[in-house]
C-alpha cells in the first residue's frame, strides 16, 4: 500500500470529525438514481465510518495494493444508497478516492420484467404446491384466478375465506425464495470480474448501466486511476455468490421500513 493512502487512513483513524454535507456528494451509478439524505442516514454513516477506516487499511495491506472493496447491504428502505454516498463523501474528504457502484445495474432483467418473472415463479410455484398436496380443484382454480386478477393471491387476509390458500402461499414463497438473489436473477459473475479488475489495478473498467426499458442498456468506461475504495451498494452485497468484497456492511431495517419503500 502506498504511504500516501496509508498515512491518510492512519491520520483519520487517529482523529476524524464528520465534515459538512455539500450538494455534490457522490452517489451510486444507477441511471436516474436519486438520494435523499436525512438525519438517520448521517447518524448511521458517522457510526460506521470510524470503524470502517481500520478495516480498509487492513484490507489494503492484505491485498498488497492501495485498493479495497466494501459492500453496503440490507433490505429495501434501509438507506443503502444514502449511507454508501456518505461513506464515499467522508473518504474523499480525507483524500481517499472512492467510487459507489450500484448492484441494481446487474440483474439479468429490467425491473418490470424481473417483477413479472418473480410473479410468474410465485404463482406457478403456488399452483404446483396445491397439486402436490392434492388441494387443487376446478372450483379453487376459479377462485384463485379471481384473486390473481385482483392481485390478492398473496394476501394473508384471504386465507380466512380460503383456507387452502395457505398451502398455495407457502409453496409460492418457497418457489420464489429459490429465485430471489440467485444467479438466475443476478449476474454475480460480472460483479466478481469487476472487483477482480479493480483489485489488480486496472485504471479503466467498463461498467454496466441499465434503465427501465429494454433498450436502456449500455456500458460506460469509468476511470479508476484515482480510486482506492470501491463501495458496492446493493441488497445482495453480502451474498456468497460473488467474490472479492473485503468488508460487508449490513444495515438493519424494520418490516415497516421495507414495506414503506
Regions found by a protein language model. Give the residues of each.
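Charged, amphipathic alpha-helical linker segments immediately N-terminal to NTP-binding catalytic cores
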Residues: 2-50
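Hydrophobic positions on the alpha1 helix immediately C-terminal to the Walker A/P-loop
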Residues: 83, 87
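Phosphate-binding P-loop
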Residues: 59-67
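Conserved nucleotide-sensing/catalytic segment adjacent to the nucleotide-binding pocket
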Residues: 37, 98-100, 106-214
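Post-Walker A helix-loop "phosphate-sensing" segment adjacent to the P-loop in P-loop NTPases
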Residues: 89-99
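Conserved lysine of the Walker
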Residues: 80
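ATP-dependent NMP and nucleoside kinases share a basic, alpha-helical "lid"
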Residues: 156, 160-168, 216-261
Amino acid at each position: 500500500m502506498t504511504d500516501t493512502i496509508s498515512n491518510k487512513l492512519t491520520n483519520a483513524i487517529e482523529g476524524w470529525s464528520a465534515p459538512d454535507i455539500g450538494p455534490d456528494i457522490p452517489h451510486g451509478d444507477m441511471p436516474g438514481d436519486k438520494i435523499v439524505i436525512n438525519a438517520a442516514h448521517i447518524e448511521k454513516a458517522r457510526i460506521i465510518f470510524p470503524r470502517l477506516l481500520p478495516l480498509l487499511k487492513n484490507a489494503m495491506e492484505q491485498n498488497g495494493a492501495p485498493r479495497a472493496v466494501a459492500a453496503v447491504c440490507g433490505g429495501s428502505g434501509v438507506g443503502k444508497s444514502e449511507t454508501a454516498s456518505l461513506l464515499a463523501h467522508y473518504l474523499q474528504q480525507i483524500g481517499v478516492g472512492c467510487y459507489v457502484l450500484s448492484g441494481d445495474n446487474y440483474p439479468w432483467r429490467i425491473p418490470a420484467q424481473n417483477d413479472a418473472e418473480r410473479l410468474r415463479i410465485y404463482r406457478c410455484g403456488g399452483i404446483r404446491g396445491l397439486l402436490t398436496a392434492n388441494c387443487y380443484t376446478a372450483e379453487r382454480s376459479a377462485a384463485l384466478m379471481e384473486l390473481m386478477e385482483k392481485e390478492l393471491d398473496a394476501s394473508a387476509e384471504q386465507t380466512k375465506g380460503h383456507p387452502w390458500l395457505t398451502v398455495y402461499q407457502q409453496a409460492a414463497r418457497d418457489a420464489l425464495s429459490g429465485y430471489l438473489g440467485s444467479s438466475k436473477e443476478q449476474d454475480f459473475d460480472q460483479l466478481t470480474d469487476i472487483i477482480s479488475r479493480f483489485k489488480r489495478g486496472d485504471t479503466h473498467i467498463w461498467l454496466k448501466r441499465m434503465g427501465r426499458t429494454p433498450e436502456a442498456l449500455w456500458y460506460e468506461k469509468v476511470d479508476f486511476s484515482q480510486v482506492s475504495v470501491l463501495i458496492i451498494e446493493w441488497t445482495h452485497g453480502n451474498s456468497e455468490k460473488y467474490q472479492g468484497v473485503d468488508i460487508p456492511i449490513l444495515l438493519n431495517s424494520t418490516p415497516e421500513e421495507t414495506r414503506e419503500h
